[in-house]
Amino acid sequence: MAHDVFNLADLPAKKEYYRGGETIVVEAEPSDGWYVLLSGKVGVYKKDFSVAEISKPGTVIGELGFLLNIPRTATLIAQESTLLMHVHITLDDLLTNYPAVVKHMIKILAERVVKTTEDWRDSMEKVSLF
């Protein structure tokens, strides 16, 4: 049975609330699942440098460590009062029982690749002007 990614009630997950400035996960620590942003804003940091801010409800966060079974690739810090759904599931269970969620995650990853490529191209164009 396919589940809509925005109908999170059936996923093995729990809501977690963070105050502004509170750390959600720390880069290089073990990954214990992934998150869906319900409300608020999350800052993404790599080695203490801000690399992104996420504020769109429904955005999947922390999926790389989960999908690749590697430690966290970034630190996440709530930028304001933030509500997340913390999902605890095995990859096999996700693939078998929640294909709509998997499709959503693939779309997000593809969009991030496009944005990263565009940002890189823009930065290279700026460098070539000098």
Predicted feature descriptions by range:
Residues 4, 91-130:
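A small-molecule sensor/coupling module
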Residues 10-11, 29-31, 48:
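Short, small/polar residue-rich loop motifs at catalytic or cofactor-binding pockets
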Residues 18-20, 24-29:
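Short phosphate-coordinating micro-motif centered on Lys-Gly-acidic
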Residues 19-20, 38-39, 56, 80:
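A cytosolic small-molecule/anion-sensing beta-strand core signal
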Residues 32-43, 47, 57-59:
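Glycine- and acidic-residue-biased ligand/ion/polar-headgroup-sensing regions
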